[in-house]
Amino acid sequence: MNTKGKVVGVNGNLVTIEVEGSVSMNEVLFVKTGGRNLKAEVIRVRGNEVDAQVFELTKGISVGDLVEFTDKLLTVELGPGLLTQVYDGLQNPLPELAIKCGFFLERGVYLRPLNKDKKWNFKKTSKVGDSVIAGDFLGFVIEGTVHHQIMIPFYKRDSYKIVEIVNDGDYSIDEQIAVIEDDSGMRHSITMSFHWPVKIPITNYKQRLIPSEPMLTQTRIIDTFFPVAKGGTFCIPGPFGAGKTVLQQVTSRNADVDIVIIAACGERAGEVVETLKEFPELIDPKTGKSLMDRTCIICNTSSMPVAAREASVYTAITIGEYYRQMGLDILLLADSTSRWAQAMREMSGRLEEIPGEEAFPAYLESVIASFYERAGIVVLNNGDIGSVTVGGSVSPAGGNFEEPVTQATLKVVGAFHGLTRERSDARKFPAISPLESWSKYKGVIDSKKTEYVRSFLVKGNEINQMMKVVGEEGISNEDFLIYLKSELLDSCYLQQNSFDSIDAAVNSERQNYMFDIVYNILKTNFEFSDKLQARDFINELRQNLLDMNLSSFKDSKFNKLEHTLSELVNFKKVI
């Protein structure tokens, strides 16, 4: 029999409950009020009293209301049908909720995440008599553009033998597709779907690898200077309006991955609506089908209950780990982890815990670290390799990178793409600061070359600061030329037009080709009689390079521009 209790205190979305029986941490419960059952999660246990965070508005809950515990942790349902879906933080399908409730979501309405009526064409890849363990494949169904493997549920801890398996055909997620038997002779029925707790990492693999293979985003500044590896982690901190969301959307469109999961936790609803409108219309260059076919969106906007923000982050990473177990490459984009941290701060305050810096909980760093640590590249039991790459945007107030959430994130991620107000105000997009950002991963271009090129940016910035004080006349022609070359590199290689059909996505071959052209210009010595002549010449080179960026790779226009560029360089270079 499930544990019962009654409400003895309400503070915002924190409810204190007196229980009769045993309760465990993170257990799901329902508060019965006004004819509705409101979902909540246990976050503290003290004797016969527990504190629970309610995932809904707590208006109307009063002392004495009955509470029923489920004896289950907060879980997600895993199975075919997750892709193309839009869920809230508790994995309720929002399109179905809209049909049931209309424009405004009602409290206490929870729907099944997966469609129980849809038939999936199952093709078996194992047979009766095979020995299996948790995570092994029984067969697959085609879901969008991926082979969705049907696996032995991850909570099965023993070794089993298949005693029954259905023939190829159409089945729903609740129909039995196999029966397995353990060593004691007990039989277990297997369907296409099962549940898994969101806060427990999925570890049914042989070993973890160190991320080394670059995950191409087709954004030049990232792939060349601040690369991200498959199975790695990165963060995009930046002030409001610096282009975090656009950069994440461009990355999700063009990244070299099989599946993209977008966790919109606490961001404005308008940005999510933009994604929902654009993604079905965008064509995936790898498959020629809609981008939505390989995307799952977990949407918990700023207008939804605060407590579900934390759940949305964990729901997203659990779905990502599930698809990783099929040998696929997953990209998870969390926008924004600051809102999740603010939700933690709110709950910590209500629990009357000792606050840390800026009133965030003292355990903020360990919680953020435990989330990013669930990224990784792994070797599965059958030898396949799957990865989850996690990118979180951070929204520090006023673009201050010294605040606790940014600092806690920087300690655990492998790449830092810092957006600055200075670059976004100058309309230099993507507004990633080439001086403050860094990456621990290997990129598509030789590191010796990139270090040499970055040195130009550093020198150019120093000369620019000097010019602000003494003016152009106060510096030598050689220094002015270094400054002009750094500006050429910035405008022609670091900046990219996300709304141009050609420049929005640049593959590694083109990146290498264009980088070599810019690299050779930087290494070439030029001599000019005065600064005006130098500026005119570099501006001419810059315009040629910008026109090349907007031309199809190696077509007649591109080749003509390249020929003109090389003639200009050869004419002015000092031998």
Swiss-Prot record:
UniProt binding sites for ATP: 238-245
Domain of life assignment: Bacteria
Group of enzyme by EC: translocase
A GO-annotated cellular component: proton-transporting ATP synthase complex
Protein EC: 7.1.2.2
Catalytic reactions of this protein: ATP + H2O + 4 H(+)(in) = ADP + phosphate + 5 H(+)(out)
Transmembrane segments: none
NCBIfam families for the chain: PRK04192.1
UniProt-recorded name of the protein: V-type ATP synthase alpha chain
Organism listed in the record: Borreliella afzelii (strain PKo) (Borrelia afzelii)
Name of the gene encoding the protein in the UniProt record: atpA
